[in-house]
Amino acid sequence: MAPLVLYLLTLLMAGHTSASWCVCKTGLSDSVLQKTLDYACGNGADCNPTHPKGSCFNPDNVRAHCNYAVNSFFQKKGQASESCNFTGTATLTTTDPSYTGCAFPSSASGSSGSGSTTVTPGKNSPKGSNSITTFPGGNSPYSGTPSTGLLGGNITDATGTGLNPDYSTESSGFALYYSNNLLLTGFCSLVMML
């Protein structure tokens, strides 16, 4: 009987995962959030829901749109924790940031979109410009390569420059994201054996 209970407990614990979302940090200026938003939208995030008539357009402010964009980017990168850094302007959360009418994806499959992404410029855009078309994997919203400042490189332990320079699309490695689940399963198994 004990082996059966242990087996069922192990299956129960191994099957439990908690969803993760990425959101912009509080206390940052709108200009910093706008740069983060532009980067995420210009590098593969599905920002269409934040456009006028989109399900996540309201509230129409930089923070809300930034939250949706960085989460979309994070989900498209397979929830790799380093893809939610944006040089310190975003953070991981286990609290669902969705609100009435706007569902934030909690997995890569829930973050749809392919091909080109249309990015709505910020308030400081030249008059007459309605949108900028960028393509996944390229076309950074910045001119040139930043070298200093909040969004620049110039970090001694980084391997690249920009908001998220160390993200790797390498998927052959193994990462243990929910180590506390493994520890809890091991502890429960040990208790069951005694």
From Swiss-Prot:
Localization recorded for this chain is: Cell membrane; Cell junction, Plasmodesma
Which residues, if any, are the signal sequence? 1-16
Question: Which tissues is it found in, per the record?
Answer: Expressed in the shoot apical region and in young leaves but also detected in the laminar and vasculature of mature leaves.
Question: What do we know about what induces or represses this protein's expression?
Answer: Down-regulated by heat treatment.
State the UniProt keywords alphabetically.
Answer: Cell junction, Cell membrane, Disulfide bond, Glycoprotein, GPI-anchor, Lipoprotein, Membrane, Signal
Q: Which GO CC annotations does the UniProt entry carry? A: plasma membrane; plasmodesma; side of membrane
* Bias kind Low complexity: ranges: 106-116
Q: Which PANTHER family match?
A: BETA-1,3 GLUCANASE, PLASMODESMATA CALLOSE-BINDING PROTEIN 2
User: What protein name does the entry list?
Assistant: PLASMODESMATA CALLOSE-BINDING PROTEIN 2
